[in-house]
């Protein structure tokens, strides 16, 4: 069975955000606005997305 994936796109800037949230974006592999990455849909990744949900858009 194929692993589930989720597409995450950064839609807001990380300038002026908490250092922890900037680090979370880097951990997700996001570098700039409109940058999209495809990640495995795991509890760890979902937790990171939840932490920076105000800066990202999630599909899938």
UniProtKB/Swiss-Prot annotation:
Key word Transcription present: no
GO BP, sorted A to Z: translation
Alphabetical UniProt keywords: Ribonucleoprotein, Ribosomal protein
Gene Ontology CC: cytosolic large ribosomal subunit
Any GO MF annotation of the entry: structural constituent of ribosome
PROSITE patterns per the UniProt record, alphabetical: RIBOSOMAL_L30
Family matches, as Pfam families: Ribosomal_L30
Annotated SUPFAM superfamilies: Ribosomal protein L30p/L7e
Family: Belongs to the universal ribosomal protein uL30 family.
Subunit structure: Part of the 50S ribosomal subunit.
PANTHER family: LARGE RIBOSOMAL SUBUNIT PROTEIN UL30M (PTHR15892:SF2), MITOCHONDRIAL RIBOSOMAL PROTEIN L30 (PTHR15892)
NCBIfam families to which the protein is assigned, alphabetical: rpmD_bact (TIGR01308)
HAMAP family tied to this protein: Ribosomal_uL30_B
Name of the protein: Large ribosomal subunit protein uL30
